[in-house]
């Protein structure tokens, strides 16, 4: 399965499918969309209003990756369901953390 993240020289780029008002804050795994694009499914309780859901996704990713929230930035898709986040840090270590979080 193709991974929804890409290593960068200064971190990691992660493609996320957001589920706002999802009842809980969690990373739920990888999904391959109908167009073949792999995405990391992230569910948050926050509503998609005034950037609240984006901030909640940023916090969920930061916690899951064990990095400060300031290291996670929204690169694209502020109002879209599929978003692109950049995470600053050691890309290899961050990718390993996502892999461990999702399991085999």
Swiss-Prot record:
Pfam families: DUF167. It comes from the Bacteria. SMART domains: DUF167. InterPro entries: DUF167, YggU-like_sf. Belongs to the UPF0235 family. HAMAP family: UPF0235. This is UPF0235 protein M446_3939.
């Amino acid at each position: 399965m193709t991974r929804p993240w890409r290593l960068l020289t200064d971190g990691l780029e992660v493609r996320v499918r957001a589920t706002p008002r999802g009842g809980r804050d969690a990373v739920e795994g990888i999904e391959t969309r109908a167009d073949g694009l792999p995405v990391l499914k992230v569910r948050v309780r926050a509503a998609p209003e005034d950037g609240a859901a984006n901030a909640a996704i940023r916090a969920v990713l930061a916690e899951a990756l064990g990095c400060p929230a300031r290291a996670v930035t929204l690169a694209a898709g502020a109002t879209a369901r599929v978003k692109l986040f950049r995470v600053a840090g050691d890309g290899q270590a961050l990718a390993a953390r996502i892999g461990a979080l999702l399991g085999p």
